[in-house]
Amino acid sequence: MSTYFPKGEVARKWFVVDADGQTLGRLASRVARILSGKDNPKYTPFIDTGDHVVVINAEKIKITGLKADNKKYYHYSGYPGGMKEEEFLKRLERRPELILETAIKGMLPKSKLGKAMGGKLKVYRGADHPHIAQKPEVLANA
């Protein structure tokens, strides 16, 4: 049996996902799967065959349980005393796009290929986005 190599150029589609009322982890895993190309029949682990995904209404994402009160995001600057923490609800107010980006990119490979996959993710607060020229398909049941 021989190894399958897809052609160099991959036809990439654009999808738009509405995060309104969606659960954070379930939406993130679905989007990560599309970005990595695992929904594509020509999927190859060492070639980026994923599609572009635009997520809108990031501020309307929901989470279950007590995570709204207990979940914290940490960032370390590398200096003594440089550990910063932010609660979920404060980050949802301040930068809801960052919550989705962090969740989705955490589900992608930690390599050059993973960075390329993460570069095809666009997250926006509100229903408007600047990618109308790409004619994205609405992704149902994301």
UniProtKB/Swiss-Prot annotation:
Record InterPro entries = Ribosomal_uL13 (IPR005822), Ribosomal_uL13_bac-type (IPR005823), Ribosomal_uL13_CS (IPR023563), Ribosomal_uL13_sf (IPR036899)
GO:BP terms for this protein?
Answer: negative regulation of translation; translation
Keyword Iron among UniProt keywords:
no
PROSITE patterns (alphabetical)? RIBOSOMAL_L13 (PS00783)
- Give the Pfam families listed for this entry: Ribosomal_L13
Q: Which GO terms describe its cellular component?
A: cytosolic large ribosomal subunit
| Family to which this protein belongs | Belongs to the universal ribosomal protein uL13 family.
Quote the subunit structure annotation.
Part of the 50S ribosomal subunit.
Can you say what this protein is called? Large ribosomal subunit protein uL13
**From what organism does this protein derive?**
Koribacter versatilis (strain Ellin345)
